Amino acid sequence: LTLPDGARLTVTDVHEQGGVIWHRVDALPDTAAPGTAVTGRIDWAWRFDKMQQHTGEHILSGILHQMFGAENVGFHIGSDAVRMDTSVPISAEGLREAELAANRIVWQNVPVLITYPTREELARMTYRSKKEIEGQVRIVTIPGADVCACCGTHTAATGAVGQIKILAAENYKGGVRLSIVCGERALLAAQAMRQ
């Protein structure tokens, strides 16, 4: 955020409370009185990386659900890789097949669709992450791959994900824990493997 006098503020947290979006900043100078207008700027490289990782996770999770009935029981977008935990074990061959199927969705460059169905429409829909949610539910649909309730940021189409690469898999709590990378991270991982 930039103040009218040019002073820059670093946003350290964003949350919603009572329908108002609050930005917490690292320090607030005396020149920033309540009601002062600020200019916001998004760190696009950081945001786009997170969009690639998150959309790639949706694609792979949806494919694993279709192929093996696997539920995504946890994921974390880390600074190096995305961790995904599945509800069922999946063989190495099954993971190779799922990785290829997920990348085929990327290469098809299908649109990532965002909808806000009514409660009646939602009751008739089949989608992942079907939990009791208060208020409006946002559905992310990636044709051929996934339909899921989600409030995260995504690419506009699957082609922007670039590539999905499974780096590692280990048995974890009756399922499998995957480490994946997408987009530029996948390219950098492939380059590192050649060295």
Report the location of each language-model feature.
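Active-/binding-site microenvironments in catalytic and ligand-binding cores
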Residues: 1-195
